[in-house]
């Protein structure tokens, strides 16, 4: 299920020419277009070193139906690995050049880290079973192009590196060129992120068999609650994975969050491993 990258770029680049709702602004606490990563990055704050959220930031206590001990068999604690783990995601972005191709554009970088921590495994010194490091460099446009009741908010094109930072035989990594499109319609948000794998994938040559060539994300705001779903799927092989989430505000800055992941590819070490994981915890920022 490959696609023409050049054709996709040719389709997307003209979008930046449409009238823009989000442009470079000097703000203090005024919210950007809700749900728009690019509109948020275009806002200038008093502190020039302000970091912005990219993906969601959360901390969960989780339990999985099955643990991939075979993939970590070279770890001296593998046989004692537990099914309950603390899972957290840290995801931040920083604008490098606002207005690089007009007031609605930004050149930016992001860093996302996901970890699976055997916190309760005190007999083995509470090791981190897996951590994935995902830096990106991207060009983003905030738009207000409307079609069929939907408003295209974000157009983003960039380079993504994803690695677990391990050496052989547990090393996993891949590099991708990607495009991210996000549109809103009332309380609905839909985001699609197709990618094209570049470079070597010797540590995981069949990763697209399980992870496919895109990620689809859907969000719905129900009162103060946010319902979310995202996943990736390879239509040729029938493999994929999906994540469901619900968050609700506890305080102004913290949300209660519960998450279920089922399928392949929850982490890089588990890209070809099928499991179901349930987690409960807190979140700092959701889709909206």
Give the label of every model feature segment.
Residues 1-42, 288:
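Cleavable N-terminal export/targeting peptides
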Residues 22-73, 129-131:
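A subset of solvent-exposed loop/turn segments in beta-rich extracellular surface proteins, enriched
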Residues 65-75, 82, 97-220, 231, ...:
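Outer-membrane pore/translocation modules
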Residues 85, 89-91, 134-136, 178, ...:
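Membrane-embedded beta-strand positions in outer-membrane beta-barrel channels/transporters
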Residues 224-254:
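Glycine/small-residue-rich hydrophobic helix-like segments
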Residues 274-288:
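Outer-membrane beta-barrel "beta-signal"
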């Amino acid at each position: 299920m490959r696609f023409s990258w050049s054709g996709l770029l040719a389709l997307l680049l003209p979008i930046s020419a449409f009238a823009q709702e989000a442009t470079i602004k000097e703000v203090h606490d005024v919210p950007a277009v809700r749900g728009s990563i690019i509109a948020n990055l275009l806002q200038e704050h008093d502190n020039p070193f302000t970091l912005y959220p990219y993906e969601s930031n959360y901390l969960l206590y989780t339990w999985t139906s099955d643990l991939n001990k075979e993939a970590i068999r070279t770890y001296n604690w593998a046989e004692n690995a537990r099914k309950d783990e603390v899972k957290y995601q840290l995801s931040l972005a920083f604008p490098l050049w606002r207005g690089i191709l007009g007031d609605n554009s930004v050149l930016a970088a992001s860093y996302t880290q996901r970890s699976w921590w055997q916190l309760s495994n005190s007999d083995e010194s509470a090791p981190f079973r897996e951590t994935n490091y995902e830096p990106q460099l991207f060009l983003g446009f905030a738009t207000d192009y409307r079609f069929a009741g939907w408003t295209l908010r974000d157009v983003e094109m960039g380079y993504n590196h994803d690695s677990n930072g391990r050496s052989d035989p547990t090393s996993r990594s891949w590099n991708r060129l990607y495009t991210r499109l996000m549109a809103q319609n009332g309380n609905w948000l839909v985001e699609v992120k197709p990618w094209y794998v570049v470079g070597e994938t010797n540590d995981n040559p069949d990763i697209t068999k399980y992870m496919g060539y895109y990620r689809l994300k859907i969000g719905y705001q129900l009162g103060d609650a946010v319902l979310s779903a995202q996943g990736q799927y390879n239509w040729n092989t029938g493999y994929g994975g999906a994540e469901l989430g619900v968050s609700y505000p506890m305080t102004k800055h913290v949300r209660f969050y519960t998450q279920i992941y089922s399928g392949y590819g929850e982490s890089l070490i588990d890209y070809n491993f099928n499991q179901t994981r349930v987690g409960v915890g807190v979140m700092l920022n959701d889709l909206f």
